Amino acid sequence: MSGEQTPMCSMDLPEVKVKTSMAGRCRVFWYEQYVQPCIVELVGSALFIFIGCLSVIENSPNTGLLQPALAHGLALGLIIATLGNISGGHFNPAVSLAVTVIGGLKTMLLIPYWISQLFGGLIGAALAKVVSPEERFWNASGAAFAIVQEQEQVAEALGIEIILTMLLVLAVCMGAVNEKTMGPLAPFSIGFSVIVDILAGGSISGACMNPARAFGPAVMAGYWDFHWIYWLGPLLAGLFVGLLIRLLIGDEKTRLILKSR
């Protein structure tokens, strides 16, 4: 008789295994779809802004805009190539806004991405402050954007931030999101757009193009003069580019109008 008896719980064991397996898969899916991308955006933003801030703080008069332009652009391209397949490689609230508008990022992830990018900016700027000599740090205003000093400069600074950010966001969206134009050289193109933007407009507005890049150093240095320019300009550019792609220049899958079906 004892050889024929079956434990009472044995009939439920397969169901328990199935439930456990499904729960495990759900946790992994939730982590990889929602948590891991935010972690990567935080880490990538911290690394990018650390390198960017350090390049400004340690810049010498002889190199002018070239050193920060190369450091920002090369760092961004490298980080996107390394981490982009996990989160999309935004590291910029303006980019995340544009990618959301064209359907490349779930709307529910936009705010978590922004929070991650801003915290990453704080961490990167804090690390740059820690490793920099105090005199150099304050001479460079902690790599905050201090180039706009008078009200008369606001219009041109805001305008150039919009235009420069549009070029960067176009490089991201068309090179890495839009299926018709995306390709393996996207990280290079995105990094190159940052180099070009800083060389072209750095003397006018500082060529920020990224609210997270402005926010972290502003907190560390306590410098908030005309800070709003570096939020409004890039975010407007992200919105404009998102609408441009969504309505006119995106592929058929992305466009909202003139679709064959």
Swiss-Prot record:
The record lists the membrane-crossing segments as 37-57, 85-105, 108-128, 157-177, 184-204, 229-249
Record note on modification: Sulfenylation at Cys-53(C53-SOH) when hydrogen peroxide flows through the AQP8 channel, making it susceptible to hydrogen sulfide produced by CBS. Persulfidation at Cys-53 is required to gate AQP8 channel; under stress condition, hydrogen peroxide accumulates in the cell leading to CBS activation that produces hydrogen sulfide inducing persulfidation of oxidized Cys-53 (C53-SOH).
Residues with an annotated glycan are N139
Listed SUPFAM superfamilies: Aquaporin-like
Relay the activity regulation note.
Reversibly gated by a two-step sulfenylation-persulfidation process in cells undergoing diverse stresses.
Which compartments is it annotated to reside in? Cell membrane; Mitochondrion inner membrane; Apical cell membrane; Basolateral cell membrane
Q: Where is this motif: NPA 2?
A: 210-212
Motif NPA 1 — list its residue ranges: 92-94
Instruction: Extract one GO molecular function annotation from the record.
Output: water channel activity
**Null phenotype?**
Homozygous mice for AQP8 have normal appearance, survival, and growth. Homozygous mice female for AQP8 exhibit increased fertility and numbers of oocytes in ovulation. Homozygous male mice show an unaffected fertility. Homozygous pregnant mice have a significantly higher number of embryos and fetal/neonatal weight is also significantly greater. Exhibit a greater amount of amniotic fluid and placental weight is significantly larger.
Which stretches face the Extracellular side?
58-84, 129-156, 205-228
Role: Channel that allows the facilitated permeation of water and uncharged molecules, such as hydrogen peroxide and the neutral form of ammonia (NH3), through cellular membranes such as plasma membrane, inner mitochondrial membrane and endoplasmic reticulum membrane of several tissues. The transport of ammonia neutral form induces a parallel transport of proton, at alkaline pH when the concentration of ammonia is high. However, it is unclear whether the transport of proton takes place via the aquaporin or via an endogenous pathway.
Identify the PANTHER family for this entry.
AQUAPORIN-8
Name of the molecule in the record: Aquaporin-8
Q: Which organism is it from?
A: Mus musculus (Mouse)
